[in-house]
């Protein structure tokens, strides 16, 4: 079947937009093909700085013919309805319609509409210009004299040419005939801007990709990345160094070049006195270059790797010299900033926070730092941290935000705080907390383990969460401007991965007490709402680890479950138990008991609380179940008190035979009202016994 080749050739597309633009082009074209009844075999999109390209293979040469029966008005119906039917179906008279006879509903007119399929080439010529005009660039522009006319094309950068061909692999393809803003689609594209700028005539994708390669254009972004990484590693290795890989920078650099040429430059070793992260940020942010390390020392080497977009006649000497000149100036600035920062102690910067507002309803940064310091000191004994060191770390943790280096490179906040703290003689734990209190900042980020860092990190995140909850600035839908979901996940990971035992409600209460803001929610409602938010985040966390979200609901339904470590352990034990036959059957029996109770409680408008009366037991199965509940309840309660949830589940399993026998032999809704009530109370005892670990009614299945 025929294939489509489409290329949109323009001025340089920003690197950050290329991947999404390629995917958007693929999606828009293939979605429209499917909507037109043209099911394709495969599609792949590509992007370079100067072009978006798409190949779709295995497209039918034409649409299938369609036959449709459209039911009309009743025979003898109103004239207006009949005329509307004729107009909608394109029939000239009722003689062209058939009559469908229905003994019950009567006779109706039916139009048989035959719609011949169109040639795919015509469909493409109609749909492609619409896709170009409606392309979803995040930012676009108009250009030239045509920009003054109504309906002028908007594109990310001036669009120069469109290549569009369609045909079989064994035949000469057809040009898809259309134009956009005076740009006619054709078979012509262009090579590298400097090394092969001449026009190139192409026929289909294989021919197109090969000719571009000859014209110094690597079409596939992944191939450009592979070239950059391979050549950079080899170049570094040849000099005795190792490439410091940077996937984000690699994505960007591969979008800046069509023909990657890797070169190495150098800088004065004197600049290595500046922290490595600052050197890397300087070279990366300003010149989009990679740094290299010396494997002998593990530190950075006074070299950098750049990616040019041309094979220079002088072997790249001029390009290297230009980059060295700029990097020298930037590193000189960074060194000056760093040395200037070292002249001022961190605590001497703190008064400036009095003039910086954290949030209009939550006060200044100075007030926030004071709250974090107080809360961290309260958390310290709960996590085994030294109280004095924790208070000192919390006080200094934000100070580097006012330094010159962090002002220039915000991505090194915290890290620079650590360096400055060490430089002024602070304890190692205090310095580490200055960096680590921001962590973890994402699912793949490292979780601090030093108790001082953990205490400050918890205080920082909980102050943020409680503060924004108090002023009713909670996340809604997809909106989370203050990254509160990330903060909650950070708290969860800090607690669970460090096996910490603490009452979340108690700590949140301390954070709320230190706020001194008027909240629209009372403390109890705020705490309950916040705990529910943590439950939702914990479900997300555990689901990613393969756990069931309903088990989290079942544990939180017990109420007062603010010890997240114990929640996780209950969920783990419950999950393992429910994988066994005993667990599955006990769940079924417990849910059956809960369902019967729900129906009867609704019917009688009352709860069946209280202990059953042993004198009203009529059957051995009732007595056996009552005995089993008593024994299991005691055994499970003892195990839960010891926080041995696996043992509690093992005890629960002993209920299974008695529950199964009860439902097999006992009629719950006995004709005798007293016996019925007693048996319903016995069912309630099953529910209460299993609640030692979780609310089984919340578990699916």
Curated annotation (Swiss-Prot):
GO terms for molecular function: arginine-tRNA ligase activity; ATP binding; glycine-tRNA ligase activity. One of its GO terms (cellular component) is cytosol. It is found in: Cytoplasm. Keywords: Aminoacyl-tRNA synthetase, ATP-binding, Cytoplasm, Ligase, Nucleotide-binding, Protein biosynthesis. Pfam families: DALR_1 (PF05746), tRNA_synt_2f (PF02092). One of its GO terms (biological process) is arginyl-tRNA aminoacylation. The keyword Aminoacyl-tRNA synthetase applies. Its EC number is 6.1.1.14. It catalyses: tRNA(Gly) + glycine + ATP = glycyl-tRNA(Gly) + AMP + diphosphate. Its main location: cytoplasm. Tetramer of two alpha and two beta subunits. Belongs to the class-II aminoacyl-tRNA synthetase family. This is Glycine--tRNA ligase beta subunit. It comes from Bradyrhizobium sp. (strain BTAi1 / ATCC BAA-1182). The lineage of its organism: Bacteria, Pseudomonadati, Pseudomonadota, Alphaproteobacteria, Hyphomicrobiales.
